[in-house]
Amino acid sequence: MESTTNPQGKTACLVTFGCQMNKADSERMAGALTHLGYRIVDESDTADLVLFNTCTIRDNAEQKVYSYLGQQARRKQRDPHITLVLAGCVAQQEGEKLLRRVPELDLVMGPQHVNRLSDLLERVAEGEQVVATEPIEILEDITKPRRDSAVTAWANIIYGCNEGCTYCIVPSVRGREQSRTPEAIKAEICELGASGYKEVTLLGQNIDAYGRDIGTNLASLLRFIHNAPGIERLRFATSHPRYFSDELIATCAELPKVCEHFHIPFQSGDNEVLRRMARGYTHEKYRAIIEKIRAILPDAAISADLIVGFPGETEAQFENSLRLVDELEFDALNTAAYSPRPGTPAARWPGQLDDEVKQDRLQRTNRLVAQKAFERSQRYLGRTEQVLVEETNPRDRSQVVGRTRTNRLVFFAGELAKLRGQLVDVQITAARAFSLTGTAS
């Protein structure tokens, strides 16, 4: 096909749905396309190649993908030279069925094939309609990602998931856990430091399960990469309570580059719901982890995920989740109404709740979350916080925005050209639920 045999001067648009893992995958695919000669653009309606990197965690995200894809399919009917690619978790889940649903697609590829994009496009160029969803050993990164930020970067350290949560489709679409070697990870992070990046977030579906397949663990990796030149801050996400060990907590407290922010989903505050979710811990175990973190790192920020309206969840069980939110006082909480995913055990269970019930519980939860986050934010007032400047405030061009070590957004007056990538001491003068305002010291 013309758009892939000679991509020089042609344009490509990547539309990304879902989690940080997907965003990191899109950066790598954008790097591959740039290496091939494509110019990355934001406008999908005029691009020569359009790639959708998809999410299947919830039904509304999946339906949004099909809506966008339908628009591009109609466009391709008018202009056959366009190349259409569907990547990510929807591609992995649906596979060849997508070609029957959207015959205009040129390439369907699962998350494990991200680093093979260039090779797969060569097959498309030869006239083949390609489906790449078979399980493979994930190739080590061979193409430099085209990163969206010049200050902060993501680095995947473990792919896949070995858990069996009854509501979750991720293990079947991202495969079994595959850890990258510590040496490969450190090489990538050292390269980021040499390129001027200041902060790296290590990524994995269950990041604290890192190394189980290669005889190491996340605490050891953090110690191994900690001295990477140029890198000022390290973060990691997303953690599973089952693997958040005392050793990991102690290591985070010991290493000055590791930020005091931990994202540890709990999903429910009721033990019976947790059992049916197959999460592998109790709410008491979860509370103990948070207590240990705050005992060693009193100012640590904790964020989490919560699902309301799981099949069979009673009002009393939901109130147990509210009680946990109230008592643990999270700095941020991602909330979602349960969405049945085809192929998961919970989707087939009786006791599916009405949407009205789920939405009512979601709204009640979100009101409490905002209240608690606002209360937590007040501790910053009058303090001086070190802020890593990332970009201009899109709502006020006279301000820049960055993040504290605890991942709070901070807005203050300044010029991005002078401050981007700098660590600036900012005195906090106003505190909202999820952001702060201050004055540079």
From Swiss-Prot:
E.C. number(s) listed in UniProt: 2.8.4.3
Superkingdom assignment: Bacteria
Cofactor: [4Fe-4S] cluster
Annotated ranges, domain MTTase N-terminal: 10-126
PROSITE patterns given in the database record: MTTASE_N, RADICAL_SAM, TRAM
Function statement: Catalyzes the methylthiolation of N6-(dimethylallyl)adenosine (i(6)A), leading to the formation of 2-methylthio-N6-(dimethylallyl)adenosine (ms(2)i(6)A) at position 37 in tRNAs that read codons beginning with uridine.
Swiss-Prot/TrEMBL catalytic activity: N(6)-dimethylallyladenosine(37) in tRNA + (sulfur carrier)-SH + AH2 + 2 S-adenosyl-L-methionine = 2-methylsulfanyl-N(6)-dimethylallyladenosine(37) in tRNA + (sulfur carrier)-H + 5'-deoxyadenosine + L-methionine + A + S-adenosyl-L-homocysteine + 2 H(+)
SMART domains cross-referenced by the UniProt entry: Elp3
Radical SAM core domain residues: 147-375
Classification lineage: Bacteria, Bacillati, Cyanobacteriota, Cyanophyceae, Gloeobacterales
Cofactor: how and how many bound: Binds 2 [4Fe-4S] clusters. One cluster is coordinated with 3 cysteines and an exchangeable S-adenosyl-L-methionine.
Localization (cell): Cytoplasm
GO MF assignments: 4 iron, 4 sulfur cluster binding; metal ion binding; methylthiotransferase activity
Official protein name in the record: tRNA-2-methylthio-N(6)-dimethylallyladenosine synthase
One GO BP: tRNA methylthiolation
